[in-house]
Amino acid sequence: MKSLPIALQLYSVRDELGADFEGTLKKVKEMGYDGVEFAGLCDKSFDEIKNICDNIGLSCVSVHISLDEVSANPDMIIDGYKSLGCKQITVPYLPEGVRPGEGGFDKTVAAMTAVGKKCKEKDMFFAYHNHDFEFVKVGDEYGLDVLYNTISSDLLICQLDTCWVNVGGVNPSEYIRKYAGRMYTVHLKDFVGQKTDNMYGLIGLKEDDGSGVKVEEFDFRPVGYGVQNFPEILKASVEAGAQWVVVEQDRPALGKTPLECAQMSVEYLKSLRVSDILKE
């Protein structure tokens, strides 16, 4: 089976990156990552970042940027990230009020369509990264399906976050296959614990669902150290035509630092390659 290159979403090491931008990227490369996905530039220029990444040997795969920000100056932002070698502009989140099924959704569709057209003109992908709230039904469909059925696949592709798909109650591998041919990247994220009624303030809290029984504490984990079936997720990603997998861990766990967690994730993924799960 095809071996997918591995990138790190730099939000995972945001504090380290802010303290030592170049040094942190060097460590990411030394761990064995092939590329990175940005979530801000740490006050660096595009030229500075390109020089640093080129010297280190890291590919710039994608960026997370708000819809409002990219809509305000699409040419500058798309051209800037394209100059780094990025192939994908990704909206990581939609605030309440503008999500599928809500009053401001038409505004979201118009803005995404406009940015998608700009990206298409510049030979870039425009993607949306889900959380769990898109798996609330809007009529007979999940909100995420409403989004992808409303905007055509040539203007908007998927960046499926496998943790949030699972938390939303859907099998990640099956959902990846559902959108085969509509993804450049897949987010690999692991976790333990259970969804609660007030999940989306969720992280690190034990919640009472009203039954008097405490549910297991939700927490993120390095890839391979939680509940996810990554061999199957990776197989589905390859079959669906993804070109990159992106590791993300919103906060560290198991008493490890963010960099240690990132290393645990990439070592686990490389162990799957060694065991032939991901080899040609």
Description of each model-found segment:
Residues Y225-V238:
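A short, acidic, amphipathic alpha-helical segment used as a generic capping/interface helix at domain edges
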Residues L67-C158, K178, L259:
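Active-site acidic/histidine proton-transfer and metal-coordination neighborhood
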Residues R14-A19, G35-E48, I65-N73, E96-P100, ...:
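Acidic-and-aromatic substrate-binding clefts and catalytic sites of carbohydrate-active enzymes
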Residues A242-S271:
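C-terminal/domain-terminus segments
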Residues E37, S62, T90, A127, ...:
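Conserved beta-strand positions in the central sheet of alpha/beta enzyme cores
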Residues M1-Q88, I157, K235, Q263-E280:
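N-terminal pre-domain/capping segments
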Residues E121-V227:
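Acidic/histidine-rich catalytic cores of soluble enzymes
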Residues L10-V13, Y33, H64, Y128-H129, ...:
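Tryptophan-centric aromatic hotspots in well-structured domains and transmembrane helices
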